[in-house]
Amino acid sequence: MIDSTQFPVLEQRIWLNHAAISPWPATVISAMRAFVEDNAAYGPLHYSAWLETEQRLRQSACRLLGANADDLALVKNTSDGLCLIAAGLDWRPGDAVVCSEGEFPSNLMPWQQLPPEFVERRMVPFDPHDPEGALIAALDSKARVVAVSSVRYDSGIRLDLQRLGAACRANGTLLVIDAIQHLGAMALDVSELQADFIVGGSHKWLLAPEGLALFWSRPEARDRLKPIQTGWRMWPDMFNFERRNWRPPSNARRFEPGTLNTAGIVGLEAALELLLRDDAVERERRLLERSGRLLHGLSTLPKVHVHTPVDDARRAGIVCFRVDGVAPQAIHKALIEAGIYSAIRGPSLRLSPHFYTPHAQLDRALEVLADALQTL
């Protein structure tokens, strides 16, 4: 089990905002500090060591996802990966992209930039009781892409990816998954999903710095994407600067045109090394236990309406709620004054512990919330 001393934030505040940005663990801080000091003293003289760290990251990311290295790329962020798909796919006149209403902007804007006279943007209502049903009902011969968040940022509802993937595959529709609220929180094995593209950034549940994301693509789907950027680093012999017979590689490195975020790579490699010390299913169990503890506590408070399902299969690490007659800003302020950090999303307050959050901190948050509701 991962030692709690890896998380210095526990000694300073109650952090229930991992769904936004996570504080770095000690091992990430140490790795980043060593990289900065090495770079300051030696510049690029240890570049080969940087490449070794990058290779370890790729191996760890493959373990995290159950993926093949040829199918995994390192991109700048979740938006970057989604834009690579939206801009690079070989769209045909009359194609449609299907999304649920209320998606995070990263999974809306790339599709909205497609010419409407060429690609139909099909927005379907989000049904919290059957989120896959409306998407599946929207499938027809024109539905080229279904783009979803595997865990909703504004409610914590987790989609049944197996059910949705099977329906998309049967219809010949590509399934694109924004997994930023999933990776590091819930177990995910690409071999068990009928997905085509999965992308998720590093700075939330993966406990790493901003500026990097994992981008997985199924080979048959990847072949349909034209690289929208090219550069020296996408070739297997990338240090052959005199090469002129450029052809995009068939593997996912075709999406890595130029210099990568080395500092981010160092941080994410350290974070994944830490996360992979524990079994992914065990980490998921511990996180569900913690989000469930919050759900139970909230259910005992008057005027509180929880938007997150109780069913383990339908939730992850996010718990969202609202209080009758009380603005979320007021609750948010009361929690901050007690050293408890959460987030406001729409009309709701969002709490997002991680697998390492102590039960005592969750109970303290519920206690502060109960006291605040008596005066607000």
Where is each model-derived feature located?
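Pyridoxal 5′-phosphate
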Residues: 1-376
